Amino acid sequence: MKVLVINAGSSSLKYQLIDMTNESALAIGLCERIGIDNSIITQKRFDGKKLEKQTDLPNHKIALEEVVKALTDSEFGVIKSMDEINAVGHRVVHGGEKFNSSALINEGVEQAIKDCFELAPLHNPPNMMGISSCQEIMPGVPMVAVFDTAFHHTIPPYAYMYALPYELYEKYGIRKYGFHGTSHFYVAKRAAAMLGKPEQDVKVITCHLGNGSSITAVKGGKSIETTMGFTPLEGVAMGTRCGSIDPAVVPFIMEKEGLSTREIDTLMNKKSGVLGVSSLSNDFRDLDEAASKGNQKAELALEIFAYKIKKVIGEYIAVLNGVDAIVFTAGIGENSASIRKRILADLDGIGIKIDEEKNKIRGQEIDISTPDATVRVLVIPTNEELTIARDTKEICETEVKLRSSVPI
């Protein structure tokens, strides 16, 4: 069985074609600058052979047509025809309160995704465009929506409710939802395997650190607390997002700077975080380099980022009543030894110690803690696409009859 995994953004479309017989990616690709000048599609095959093509991509439908062309290309492709694609798995950022698991896409599911547009205005509309475009190009192919929020549905009400008038929750669904769920789920499962323990006996804190960052407390394979909230703006400081701040700061800035609600939203989401503090960059490599050369604002930005995460780790150890492992994943979590070192410095009092040499190793699953540490520190590259493909396969095997004669 072959599953096409789609992650549609506002001007980009990431995809992977995964052969589920051995869970290997046959091709990984990206359409960039959709609806903008100088659009490009790049695709890398399992054997390293790479296609790069500049072409006009005015919308997501045209982009997906180019994806199919690339996958079936006589020189760079990996399948003979589109009929070899048995199912499509779509990443959908927000499932609201309706979805606690992945779902076979039908009219009801599509409407529920649209109902969440106001909860995730930057993400759900392009996710839906990806779904609609796929349905036009591949009619009859079963499609599954995998929600970023679904993993966090096990968070208890006392953790997800805000101390606001209850009717605001009843009227508008204002509560913590959490995000990056697919990533947190994957690495928590891998952590249990690396620890050699049954999933139900493991307590881990998973740190998904990228331009957007979130931390999750996972107990017995279930999310019981997470840093992102009603939107991905809540939580730790991030690349361009401020994270949690005193809410009274918002009207204060609006009044002083004469900003509209849209402008203050842009300021907090796109001009804050380490970019805002450093006045330099949201790329942590740039900040590391600048800090090493004495740039004090770059150093402060890195200190704030690490401190906020360290504080959450302490908080979540209390929430979990102890922890077996701290897990680092995503772009920064997997690749930045210096950030991991900053976060975990001076935590030996609670059993967290890292091996400096192991901490430098990149691109693989590894335990970087010292032998005498009582809490393991694991670096686990995330694989959201494989998780989406697995869910898609499982739902297709139980809920639909695949149209292809290719055996599952």
Swiss-Prot record:
Q: Which residues form the active site?
A: 148
- Biological process according to GO: acetate metabolic process; acetyl-CoA biosynthetic process
Reaction(s) catalysed by this chain's protein: acetate + ATP = acetyl phosphate + ADP
What does the UniProt entry say about where the protein is found?
Cytoplasm
Cited function: Catalyzes the formation of acetyl phosphate from acetate and ATP. Can also catalyze the reverse reaction.
Assembly mode: Homodimer.
Its recorded name reads Acetate kinase
Q: Which organism is it from?
A: Methanosarcina mazei (strain ATCC BAA-159 / DSM 3647 / Goe1 / Go1 / JCM 11833 / OCM 88)
Traced from the root, the source organism's taxonomic lineage reads: Archaea, Methanobacteriati, Methanobacteriota, Stenosarchaea group, Methanomicrobia
Q: Which gene encodes it?
A: ackA
